[in-house]
Regions:
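A conserved beta-strand-loop-helix scaffold within acyl/acetyltransferase catalytic domains
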Residues: 1-172
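Conserved acetyl-CoA-binding loop-helix of GNAT-fold acetyltransferases
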Residues: 172-181
Length: 181
């Protein structure tokens, strides 16, 4: 296996304190999305292959087949694992609709002379309407839950290598890779 890029990060140097401001911000964004992080083996192979296909399409390249990933998992057995991040679209849609209803209620009860508050609520209303529309479209396309990104990692001694990593471009705004990589 010959990686195109090789990055070394020592465990002692790894942590939130050593991340850039943007890295910390993106981790916080990802944590707010309530992504479901799962670790596993062959049981996650189907979804891992799907995110790798998304990466192939996005980059216009050809990577490996599902059978190859399965062979890696078999070969390295307990020293290989898959990490996936799932986004529960339906749950987020429900939560966003509840926030939208509260926003409408607050707008109805907002006094005429509270112009700043009314303006803020109007902007929030517009933002929530866009999110609801996007989530409804995503539910139609992907179903209630979608795998947004994943990695295939191999442990070797005191180190580990992420051999393959992929993501679904439609959900890049969730910053899922910050929780799986």
């Amino acid at each position: 296996i010959q990686p195109r890029y090789n990055m070394v990060e020592y465990a002692d140097d790894f942590g939130m304190d050593n991340l850039s401001k943007k890295g910390k911000k993106n981790i916080k964004i990802a944590q707010k999305q309530n992504l479901d992080i799962q670790f596993g083996h062959k049981e996650l192979l189907e979804d891992f292959d799907k995110v790798m296909k998304c990466t192939e399409e996005r980059k216009g390249i050809s990577l490996r087949t599902k059978e190859y990933y399965e062979l890696l998992l078999d070969t390295y057995a307990d020293d290989a694992f898959i990490t996936l991040a799932y986004f529960h679209i339906h749950d987020m849609l429900k939560e966003t609709k509840e926030r939208y209803e509260k926003c409408l209620f607050d707008l109805d009860n907002c006094t005429e002379n509270a112009k700043k508050k009314r303006f803020t609520l109007e902007e929030l209303k517009d933002s929530l309407e866009k999110k609801i529309s996007k989530y409804e479209e995503d539910v139609k396309t992907y179903g209630e839950t979608v795998c947004v990104c994943g990695t295939l990692t191999v442990k070797y001694g005191h180190t580990s290598e992420i051999l393959y990593a992929g993501m679904n471009e439609d959900f890049k705004r969730l910053m899922g890779p910050y929780l799986t990589w």
